[in-house]
Amino acid sequence: MMFFSSTFFVLLLFAILGLISKNMTLSISVVCLFFLSFIYPNLIFPWVEKYALKAGILILTIAVLAPIASGKINARDIFNSFTHWQSILGILIGVFVSWLGGRGVSLMSHQPSVVTGLLVGTILGVAFFKGVPVGPLIAAGLLSLALGKF
């Protein structure tokens, strides 16, 4: 990334949005991208674009499974989750959202033209509504349903 390019200013705007909205995840992400842009960007950014989402999903999955691994959630708790309507609803919604995210990944890889709008929407959601950046996958999944594709 060239210093003071349009890309620089867009990222700077996102960093400022992160600071204004007190969303450190967004601000730290932009700072990391600034640093990466000075260290062989032609080598690093293609790798980040290809593998960072998979790495993030891996880390998120580890975080979700950690209570089971630590024993805070045991087999009995898992079994009991099938005995309460709220838990069953949670299971069904979890299945639906996972399926939706899969559709989103497919749409984003087959129609990259939609990625920009999804990213801008996600960043605005993170900056102003205290959202988390899992939005592009779910948003792309919803978009795929709306478009009737994938």
Curated annotation (Swiss-Prot):
Query: Into which family does the record put it?
Result: Belongs to the UPF0756 family.
**Per the record's keyword annotation, is Transmembrane included, yes or no?**
yes
Q: Which domain of life, per UniProt?
A: Bacteria
Q: What is its main location?
A: membrane
Provide the protein's localization. Cell membrane
What topology in the membrane does the UniProt record assign? Multi-pass membrane protein
Protein name stated in the entry: UPF0756 membrane protein HDEF_0364
UniProt keyword Transmembrane helix present:
yes
Q: Which PANTHER family match?
A: UPF0756 MEMBRANE PROTEIN YEAL (PTHR38452:SF1)
